[in-house]
């Protein structure tokens, strides 16, 4: 099982954590949402819970709760700039379908 970050995603997360002044790492998870059923959740984590799994890639700790892990295994997180827009992009091999707006997915 693994989660990987591109160089640009690792740099962006590291910058956010440095500007925040504290934090253990980045929590990556899923929640029920949207027309396809699931959406990604990104938030800072100051301390992992006992049932969390922690991955480290390029110096960044990525924390995933036990329920989300099965849906996120093998995911790569990237940070992209497209025109005036920028944001995190997920490449998840478990996704079977996405909604038209790209806000949610189904596994």
From Swiss-Prot:
Pfam families: Fe-S_biosyn
Annotated Gene Ontology cellular component terms: cytosol
Cofactor note: Binds 2 iron ions per dimer. The dimer may bind additional iron ions.
Alphabetical UniProt keywords: Iron, Metal-binding
An individual GO BP term: iron-sulfur cluster assembly
Cofactor(s), names only, from the UniProt record: Fe cation
GO molecular function terms noted in the UniProt entry: 2 iron, 2 sulfur cluster binding; iron ion binding
Entry superkingdom: Bacteria
Metal-binding as UniProt keyword: yes
Record: residues binding Fe cation: 35, 99, 101
Family: Belongs to the HesB/IscA family.
Role noted for this protein: Is able to transfer iron-sulfur clusters to apo-ferredoxin. Multiple cycles of [2Fe2S] cluster formation and transfer are observed, suggesting that IscA acts catalytically. Recruits intracellular free iron so as to provide iron for the assembly of transient iron-sulfur cluster in IscU in the presence of IscS, L-cysteine and the thioredoxin reductase system TrxA/TrxB.
Name of the protein: Iron-binding protein IscA
Source organism of this protein record: Enterobacter sp. (strain 638)
Taxonomy of the source species: Bacteria, Pseudomonadati, Pseudomonadota, Gammaproteobacteria, Enterobacterales
Gene that encodes it: iscA
